[in-house]
A protein has these predicted regions:
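Conserved AAA+ ATPase "SRH/arginine-finger" region at the nucleotide-binding site
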Residues: 1-2, 76-89
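Short, ordered loop/turn segments at secondary-structure junctions
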Residues: 1, 33, 60-61, 83, ...
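Conserved AAA+ ATPase "sensor/coupling" helix adjacent to the nucleotide-binding pocket
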Residues: 12, 74, 87-105, 138
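C-terminal helical "lid" of AAA+/P-loop NTPase domains
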Residues: 116-121, 127-142, 154-157
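Conserved RecA-like P-loop NTPase ATPase core
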Residues: 8, 31, 44, 59, ...
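Short glycine-rich substrate-engagement loop in P-loop NTPases that contacts/grips substrate
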Residues: 1-27, 38
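Conserved catalytic/switch belt of AAA+ P-loop NTPases
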Residues: 16-17, 30, 34-73
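Short conserved motifs of the RecA-like P-loop NTPase core
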Residues: 25, 103-121, 150-155
């Protein structure tokens, strides 16, 4: 959520109401938590202590520098490591074959060098790799044979 302190308090009030009326807890997910200033982070503290919300914060920054100490001390940090290139390459191959959620209904001839390039340039980020694959396939017209040929030059531009 893109929030100021008033927005956060409103979400907390909704969580309190949900708990009192329905006995249901609320999960509060904040992406890019490092963008919250100290006041925005501090407003969460009493509600984490009371258990009003289950809090999940995501950040691409080092949480020990980007998140204030009181909030960090009430949190469990789960560092996520970059996905190895070999696993990204395997993911891209599955995306090319998957007819339901991937590009398996498209006729794609992907050079190994191009696929490996996309995996290497993703910096361990599966979302980046999949987005680059999609750009490569969708921005390349099919040849006369009806096949989309993705070579290294296409991959470098994706």
């Amino acid at each position: 959520m893109e929030s100021n302190v008033a927005d956060i308090r409103e979400k907390i009030a909704q969580a309190q109401m949900r708990m009192s009326m329905h006995g249901r807890k609320t999960v509060l997910f904040v992406d890019e938590l490092h963008r919250f200033n100290k006041a925005q982070q501090d407003v969460l503290l009493p509600h984490l202590e009371k258990g009003t919300v289950r809090f999940i914060g995501a950040t691409t920054e080092n949480p020990y520098f980007a998140i204030n100490s009181p909030l960090l001390s009430r949190s469990q940090v789960f560092p996520l490591e970059p996905v190895p290139e070999e696993e990204l390459a395997a993911l891209l191959k599955r995306a090319l074959a998957d007819e339901v959620r991937g590009l398996g209904t498209s006729r794609v001839d992907m050079e190994a060098e191009a696929l490996n390039h996309l995996a290497a340039k993703a910096d361990g980020d599966a979302r980046k790799a999949l987005t680059a694959l999609e750009v490569a396939v969708l921005s390349t017209p099919a040849g006369k044979d009806g096949v989309i040929h993705v070579d290294i030059s296409v991959a470098e531009e994706s």
